From Swiss-Prot:
Family: Belongs to the ribonuclease III family.
Highest rank taxon of the organism: Bacteria
Cofactor(s) recorded in Swiss-Prot or TrEMBL: Mg(2+)
Catalytic residue list: D44, E116
Catalytic function, reaction form: Endonucleolytic cleavage to 5'-phosphomonoester
Protein name: Ribonuclease 3
The entry's keywords: Cytoplasm, Endonuclease, Hydrolase, Magnesium, Metal-binding, mRNA processing, Nuclease, RNA-binding, rRNA processing, rRNA-binding, tRNA processing
Amino acid sequence: MKQLEEFEKKLGYSFEDKKLLKEALTHKSYKSPVNNERLEFLGDAVLDLVVGEYLFKKFPKANEGELSKLRASLVNEEGFAKLAQKLDIGKYIFISQAEENNQGRTKPSLLSNAFEAVMGAIYLEKGLEKVRELSLKLLEEAYPKIDLDSLFKDFKTALQEFTQAHYGITPTYKLLGSSGPDHKKEFEVAVLLHEETISTAKGRSKKAAQQEAAKEALKILKARNE
């Protein structure tokens, strides 16, 4: 089937069993005796191991908590949907007309599940090494800078842990002001430590501004403690 061959080229892997590939790309809404849920289950477990091992080797000084946070920031729906988009999986999945009408081809959940299923199918056919090779190549393309700072989604938590460990206190956040019309309001927030302003940042919401300010504060404080 031409459509599947086109996908295999993007993936960089040609399946020996084309039925297995079609199963991996078949959503449960599609009228078919099989769907990709079982392969998704397998792929999820395999990717958990592959990414966990990758981070374990890449960050030899990271502790268990840091490694868990790093993995959680990559092994999730949003992360796998990003890898699926690199392969344009949405173009090749088999979905029902109702799902088609509901923008199913761009839904992060469908893309993520299909990506996991494809990796599960590759694992069945070629084993762990092939999954490792293909998934890590995609991962490094999607995340050119994989490090402890850039992967932590929750910078406020990371900053709090850092300041408690190094200074014995928790940072505080101060709203400096807001600007712009209601539909495009921007907030400015400062991070303070011992009444000292460490960083300031702006965001479209108070939470976004706090995260951005925490990210900057973390960089500044880490540089001070080097």
